Amino acid sequence: MRSLIAMYQRIGLVPLIIIGLVLGVLIGWLAPNIGIALGLLGTLFVGALKAVAPILVFVLVMAAISQHRSGNEVYVKPVLIMYMFGTFLAALTAVGASFLFPTELVLVNAVIEPVPPANLKEVLTNLLMNLVANPVNAIAEANYIGILAWAIIIGFSLRQASDTARTVVGDFSDAISQVVKWVIALAPFGILGLVANTVAETGFAALAGYARILMVLVGCMLFIALVVNPLIILVKTGKNPYPLVFICLRESGITAFFTRSSAANIPINMNLARKLGLHEDTYSVTIPLGATINMAGAAITINVLTLAAAHTLGIEVTFASALLLSLVATISACGASGVAGGSLLLIPLAASLFSIPNDIAMQVVAIGFIIGVIQDSAETALNSSTDVLFTAAADPKYAR
């Protein structure tokens, strides 16, 4: 048994994930019933990540702040600036792609259970209410804005505590981090189950009718990941950005693509930041915060599908209205984590800028759910890998 574990560890996580991916595709295609059964592995893996992530963030941030000493610089502000700037550039990219490759949709009728926010004020109100949520509820409901707020407050108060108390908090943080490493080590089995179940249930046949809109969406996300983000990193660090970009895509993006959850990928990103030797006082804050507000993929989804609806209805989109849409999408995307249904349920809000009827907007949302197996996966991979990418770019190890 020990020899098997040693061999498993020796092969390395990324090769094992690739093996799990290939096996998942084959099993889901050749033996759908087995693929659906294996879906339990994926459900358990994602569940374990989601379970450990809130307590990891709470303890890690609390420990980092309580043990912080004056004179030790943190680099949160430049990361937040890159988050917002990157999201806005993603929104502009989506607008440009929608003009270059205008897409018309075949609208469908479907019942969407979650209620979309009525306006931007409601999105921002939800975000602020998350900030003052009960700390126990925040951890139980994975409300990362609330978790961060309480962890920061308690961390500051613990600075006045004894050295023994702060040591206990630090030791508890190390223990939680070890649990995360054990969960991450099971990623190949989780990916196997997720892929096998997805291929078995959908076979991707349902996506064929929406190939063009998918190409625009995924094309925008690839452009951000491989062109725009590297340019931001180049300007920030003055170094070749691609080694760091590919590390983040490989170590964070692949897992995020299959879990389809930025929250579940927080432990993965924390572990990667630690491997990269980044400043713990910084990444313990910016990575969970990024999972909440760094939403370049969400901005792309909102703009591409909104403009596709406008093109379908023959609505003229001016430069001014496109710029306004980009601003609204950037702000709305930052609140996407506080909206049931995420970025898709913010489409009616964006569509209202062009006086698109709500029933039409909800049909566009329905299309979003149909293509979600690809759209949501690519969106999460971009969002989550960018969290650790921008955090690394602001770190003294990489910064200019």
Swiss-Prot record:
Please give the SUPFAM superfamilies that the UniProt record associates with this protein.
Proton glutamate symport protein
Q: Which reaction does it catalyse?
A: L-serine(in) + Na(+)(in) = L-serine(out) + Na(+)(out); L-threonine(in) + Na(+)(in) = L-threonine(out) + Na(+)(out)
Indicate the segments annotated as coiled coil, or none if absent: none
Top-level taxon of origin: Bacteria
Keywords, ordered alphabetically? Amino-acid transport, Cell inner membrane, Cell membrane, Membrane, Symport, Transmembrane, Transmembrane helix, Transport
Q: Which residues cross the membrane?
A: 11-31, 45-65, 81-101, 138-158, 175-195, 213-233, 242-264, 295-315, 327-347, 354-374
| Example of a GO biological process term | threonine transport
- Quick one: where is this thing mainly located? membrane
Give the record's family classification.
Answer: Belongs to the dicarboxylate/amino acid:cation symporter (DAACS) (TC 2.A.23) family.
The protein depicted here goes by the name: Serine/threonine transporter SstT
Q: What is the lineage of its organism?
A: Bacteria, Pseudomonadati, Pseudomonadota, Gammaproteobacteria, Moraxellales
